[in-house]
């Protein structure tokens, strides 16, 4: 018995053409739509120290969409361990403002936190540390959680004259380093014992601190000079390794996210330097208009946000071209700047 199959060529051709059209249409729609983001960009926050509020910037339109009242003199901000709470420190109001970093809604205000100028969480999420700039002490709090009735419990108050400015905690959560701005000193506090390990003289008006990823080299920005001092802190006592010349008024740090390079804002010179922490040399320079202060690096690694303290602006610096590509009007004396869509901080 012989079976005979007869193909309907006109019908088969029509089906093939239809399938090809559908495939090309799908590809075309994908190309037209472009890459799909897992989630939209989150707001950019800028603290306006003299206005007592926070500017919320839309990262798509680059417009200031609202101002959030906080307390008097908000200077610095930090993300809580749950990554759902952005904490703004209101220095002269003795309070903290908890903000949702995605919706920019205020969640709560925590009172009775004395003179919180600068703040840090320990990497193990157990310690919350504040520098009382006006009152000459460093406070060590036990973190209870953002939703706890009393999120912070004071464990120790460390006398820290004169004018504790900035803090940095090592990756093992064992020591907090403190710059003492008006006595030209730096000290280390042991978190286990809540005692001062050491205190040393440094250069003029030390401000921000940055510890390298290996916990070995501590950088100290000297706002009263044009240098960053590098100390080896791996031993019992710190040892000055090098003074790195950047530019006048070296003030704040922001890591590039590669565990090697660090930006430093030179406030008096209106410049920003990039330091190689392995060679301890300046490897690049960028413009920083209007008295550059705090910095944030966007997740693309190409855009540096800078609070222009004297110009009441947030400046956007395109790193590949070394140009200021945008400036947004914010409030008076803009200081801390932050967004959830940032590059790594070490």
Map each language-model feature to its residues:
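N-terminal secretory signal peptides that target proteins for export/translocation
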Residues: 1-14
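Predominantly soluble domains enriched in secretory-pathway, periplasmic, or organellar proteins
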Residues: 16-28, 32-346
């Amino acid at each position: 018995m012989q079976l005979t199959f007869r193909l309907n060529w006109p019908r088969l051709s029509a089906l093939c053409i239809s399938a090809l059209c559908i495939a090309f249409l799908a590809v075309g729609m994908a190309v037209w739509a472009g890459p799909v983001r897992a989630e939209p960009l989150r707001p950019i926050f800028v603290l306006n120290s003299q206005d007592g509020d926070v500017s919320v910037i839309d990262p798509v339109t680059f417009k200031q969409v609202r101002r959030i009242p906080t307390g008097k003199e908000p200077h610095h901000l930090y993300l809580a361990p749950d990554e759902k709470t952005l904490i703004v420190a209101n220095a002269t109001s003795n309070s903290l403002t908890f903000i949702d970093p995605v919706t920019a809604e205020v969640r709560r205000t925590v009172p009775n936190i004395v003179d919180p100028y600068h703040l840090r969480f320990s990497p193990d999420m157990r310690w919350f540390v504040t520098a009382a700039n006006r009152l000459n002490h460093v406070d060590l709090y036990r973190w209870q959680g953002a939703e706890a009735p009393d999120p912070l419990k004071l464990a120790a108050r460390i006398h820290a004259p004169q004018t504790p400015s900035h803090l940095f905690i090592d990756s093992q959560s064992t020591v907090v380093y403190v710059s003492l701005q008006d006595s030209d000193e730096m000290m280390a506090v042991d978190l286990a014992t809540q005692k001062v390990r050491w205190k040393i003289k440094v250069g003029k008006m030390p401000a921000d601190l940055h510890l390298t990823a290996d916990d070995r080299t501590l950088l100290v920005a000297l706002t009263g000079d044009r240098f960053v001092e590098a100390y080896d802190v791996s031993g019992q006592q710190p040892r000055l390794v090098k003074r790195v010349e950047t530019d006048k008024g070296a003030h704040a740090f922001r890591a590039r996210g590669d565990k090697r390079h660090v930006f430093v804002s030179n406030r008096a010179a209106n410049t920003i330097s990039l330091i190689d922490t392995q060679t301890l040399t300046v490897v690049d320079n960028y413009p920083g208009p209007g008295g550059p202060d705090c910095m944030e690096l966007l997740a693309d690694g190409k855009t540096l946000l800078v609070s222009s303290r004297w110009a009441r602006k947030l400046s956007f610096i395109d790193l590949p071209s070394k140009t200021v590509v945008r400036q947004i009007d914010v409030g008076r004396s803009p200081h801390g700047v932050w967004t959830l869509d940032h590059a790594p901080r070490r």
